[in-house]
A protein has these predicted regions:
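FAD/FMN-dependent oxidoreductases across multiple families
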Residues: 110-112, 118, 122, 134-260
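Flavin (FAD/FMN)-binding glycine-rich loop and adjacent Rossmann-like elements that form
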Residues: 77-122, 128-133, 185, 241, ...
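Context-gated lysine
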Residues: 21, 57, 64-67, 79, ...
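Solvent-exposed, non-transmembrane amphipathic alpha-helical segments
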Residues: 19, 65-66, 75, 92, ...
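Predominantly flavin-linked oxidoreductase catalytic cores and closely associated redox partners
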Residues: 4-157, 215
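C-terminal helical "tail/cap" subdomain of flavin- and related membrane-associated enzymes
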Residues: 221-416
Length: 416
């Protein structure tokens, strides 16, 4: 049943003008389209107001800002045919044309990436995200500046846009967008979700993931309240879970854009990041066990070590990008039809698990990640794992030789 069918009242064309904390109820003041002022009492107030950040402003919640990238974007009236950007027959045949038409496509280079996103109505969103350490952000103050930047860094795409002469529907820019409110879930019965509470980075498009995580945690907290339980400890636990995911994503993107020009290392990073995302908390979430404290306790060591291993590997990728010479990788590395470690982790997301099976799957996934990390060191640096940054984190793992073979095949087309 929909929320409306369950008796939820939806007030359309209204604007919240004030929220006052109270016990047992908060007071919410809002105005309607006609200008009338109304008040209502609410035991819980949940802020999904996005960039308006109503509760952060009303309750003066401090926000922590991290090193941030800069973005500019615009929409054009028309469909961009990504296949028209190349005449390379091998590249054109790599995936069906419709796949590129329906998907987000990325163009990447040192310190930046460009998105091409098909929208409804045959419109297209085009965006540029840069690390200010590599690109002067004032270039993106205007649409003309962004076009000039594209001409320099993505001349093939810039020439394509020029030849099509699309009508530009709008232009936006944003910097300093990485932040997290210092309080997201309160025992005073208010909570923040979506970008009203935090935002990481657009790379990997994690926004809806964090919305889903926050909403799941909020529903758990409301359930605790309805059951008559105190909220201090559950709120603290929810905060810790959310922040762990947030900080993990920050480590994935912060100071990482410089890697993009190194084909070998960014390929390794993409394979690692995807496999990691599907191996632990993501697997538990897809099995509706994200807030199951019993299962969380049984895999707590694995989840903790996954997080530490991931953070360490991000440091390793940065080091490799400056110390390891680039070399060609196979052109169809990501769009690969060979069964491999990443695909197995992804398939497990949609496989129903009993509690015991889920615990065992998380443990197997951690061992596979250890095997992947060790295989990366062997393949990229030819370095003894005992002399590496990850030696302690992978201690006691059981090596899976098939992971090493699959990695070699994915990167170089050589499974030996």
């Amino acid at each position: 049943a929909t929320l409306l069918e369950q008796g939820v009242e939806f007030i359309d064309s209204a604007r919240v003008t004030n929220v006052e904390k109270g016990d047992p109820c908060h007071t919410v003041t809002y105005s309607t389209a006609s200008g009338e002022q109304h008040e209502l009492d609410a035991r819980w107030v949940l802020d999904a107001s996005g960039g308006a950040r109503l509760l952060q402003k009303a309750f003066n919640i401090p926000a922590k800002h991290s090193k941030s990238h800069h973005s500019s974007w615009f929409r054009v009236a028309g469909k961009i045919e990504v296949n028209d950007l190349s005449s390379d027959e091998e590249w054109l045949q790599k995936v069906p044309e419709v796949a590129r038409q329906l998907c987000t496509n990325h163009l990447i280079g040192k310190g930046y990436w460009v998105w091409i996103i098909p929208l409804s109505g045959n419109n297209t969103s085009i965006g540029v995200v840069v690390d200010p350490a590599h690109h002067e952000v004032s270039q993106f103050d205007t649409l003309e500046g962004t076009h000039a930047w594209l001409t320099k860094h993505e001349p093939q795409f810039a020439q394509y846009l020029l030849s099509k002469d699309y009508d530009v529907l709008d232009y936006k820019k944003m910097g300093n967008f990485t932040y997290r409110c210092e309080k997201l879930f309160s025992p005073e019965r208010w909570a923040l979700t979506g970008i009203s509470g935090s935002f990481t980075d657009p790379f990997y498009s994690p926004g809806t993931d964090f919305i889903a995580i926050a909403n799941t945690l909020i529903c758990k907290l409301i359930g605790e309240d309805l059951a008559g339980n105190t909220l201090t400890e559950p709120c603290n636990a929810a905060e810790q879970m959310y922040i762990a995911g947030y900080e993990s994503l920050i480590s994935t993107v912060e100071n990482q854009y410089g890697i993009f020009e190194n084909n070998l290392i960014i390929s390794c990073k993409l394979l690692w990041d995807g496999t990691l995302a599907w191996s632990g908390a993501g697997l538990m979430f897809c099995n509706n066990k994200f807030t199951d404290s019993k299962i969380a306790m049984e895999v707590s060591d694995e989840l903790m070590l996954m997080g530490k291993l991931h953070t360490t590997m991000q440091q390793v990728f940065r080091r490799w990008s400056t110390q390891i010479n680039d070399r060609p990788v196979r052109k169809d590395i990501i769009v690969d039809r060979l069964d491999n470690f990443g695909q197995r982790a992804q398939r497990a997301l949609v496989t129903p698990h009993t509690d015991e099976e889920l615990v065992n799957q998380v443990k197997r996934n951690f061992n596979s990640l250890c095997s992947l990390a060790v295989s990366l060191f062997k393949l990229i640096e030819n370095k003894s794992i005992l002399d590496s940054e990850i030696a302690l984190l992978v201690a006691g793992y059981q090596h899976e030789p098939e992971v090493e073979t699959e990695l070699n095949e994915l990167l170089f087309g050589n499974g030996n």
